[in-house]
Regions:
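Short, small/acidic-rich helices and loops at N termini and domain boundaries
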Residues: 1-95
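Glycine-biased, small-residue-rich flexible motifs in mid-sequence functional cores and linkers
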Residues: 1-27, 43, 86, 93-391
Length: 391
């Protein structure tokens, strides 16, 4: 995988991959503040990779030291990224063309600078709806969630969801069984999730895309589950609440947050007996029952203040999105350039590829590729199956 300088800066500064010691990655608020400072100085985020530039920043010495420590772990990051890729997990940053365009457009300073993902990332650029609701949904709610997901799929819409039990998993399964596609923003345990047999098969079939804004090995927390709600709403063309408690729970909190921020049009199943649905309607959610009208027509014809009315876009058409920085002007980083000096230093005497791979904790296939490049550059020499440093 090849990353731009700006993307690598985001990965180094905003993730905890390979961090040892007491220092921590930047918070979203710190990252946005740093970005503004760099921009106001007339520089780019990529310049943070230059130690001399960091010294010029009008920030505290403690902050400078934090940036120095975070950006100085390039070799470790390269190994971690390779480890993730071997599992089928990749990274996209706000500086990449593949970053979900609606998150960037709607969330702005609230968008996560780095997302981990598994699956076909082009799905994130497709028009779709969010189907959300309680874990303890009743039988009628289950049936409604299934029918809505099936209707959306027949109309070539992606299902955006949160991957939780209850409404999330019911709508996801219904869409996939109907031949549709799912983009799921999960709040924890991406590494564990992709070990599920059904998930693996759906990823291979390009039916599901999983996103997480936290380290793939991070476990569950209520805060992280709540935080990912905004991603679901921002990514969707419209959001449909199947079943919600009143004044509590992730469904209620996420729906109210969406109403307050106007990320997407909000609909609530009007036949649900739960008080939460009724209260959401009183707060501005649009009452909804399944009808002959297409979902996109329902969304576009339903008035709701301060919400952008998107025109229908075919599911298989991806719009080009503007990016915050001109990638053409950005230097591209090959992970090989990050690790090559450390690889050379790891060779003692004569060693074969397997020994070097084990010493550096890198898969042999990847090591063979890098060793071949080192030989071609004259940094090491090869004699049959053995590698050594030049005399």
């Amino acid at each position: 995988m090849i990353y731009s300088d700006s993307a690598m800066a985001a990965i180094l500064l905003c993730t905890n991959l390979g961090i040892e010691g007491e220092y921590k990655p930047l918070t979203l608020k710190e990252w946005n503040g740093l970005g503004k400072t760099v921009n106001d100085m007339g520089y780019k985020i990529a310049d943070l990779l230059k130690s001399e530039f960091t010294k010029k920043l009008p920030i505290s010495e403690k902050q400078k030291e934090q940036i120095k420590l975070l950006t100085g772990r390039g070799f470790c990051i390269a190994l971690k990224l390779q480890e993730l890729e071997n599992k089928g997990i990749y990274i996209v940053t706000q500086f990449d063309n593949d970053y979900p365009k609606y998150l960037k457009r709607k969330l702005r300073e609230k968008m996560p600078p780095v997302l981990f993902y598994a699956g076909d990332i082009t799905l994130a650029g497709k028009i779709g709806i969010a189907i959300v609701g309680s874990r303890d949904v009743d039988d009628a709610g289950m049936l409604f969630a299934k029918d809505l997901a099936k209707k959306a799929t027949k109309e070539k819409l992606i299902i955006y969801s949160g991957g939780a039990k209850g409404v999330d998993s019911i709508s996801e399964r219904a869409a996939i069984d109907e031949g549709g596609y799912v983009v799921s923003f999960i709040g924890d345990s991406l590494s564990k999730k992709i070990r599920n047999k059904d998930v693996i098969q759906n990823i291979l079939n390009k039916r599901i895309l999983l996103f997480s804004d936290v380290n793939p090995d991070t476990g569950f927390s209520v805060g992280r589950a709540m935080n990912r709600n905004k991603f679901i709403y921002a990514a969707a063309h419209g959001a449909f609440v199947v079943s919600s408690d009143f004044g509590k729970g992730g469904t209620w909190t996420g729906a109210v947050e969406n109403i307050n921020n106007s990320w997407t049009k909000l609909f609530a199943w009007s036949s649900c007996e739960k008080k939460g649905n009724k209260e959401l309607i009183s707060k501005g959610a649009i009452p909804y029952v399944i009808s002959e009208q297409t979902i996109l027509d329902t969304i576009n014809l339903s008035p709701q203040k301060d919400i952008e009315a998107y025109r229908q876009i075919d599911m298989f058409t991806t719009e080009k999105d503007e990016i915050t920085e001109n990638i053409k002007e950005d230097t591209i980083i090959d992970l090989y350039d990050v690790v090559k000096e450390s690889l050379v230093q790891s060779i003692v005497g004569e060693m074969d590829a397997n020994d070097i791979a084990q010493k550096c904790n890198i898969q042999k296939g990847q090591m063979n590729i890098w060793l071949k490049r080192l030989v071609a550059e004259g940094k090491i020499k090869r004699n049959k199956q053995m590698y050594s440093l030049p005399s």
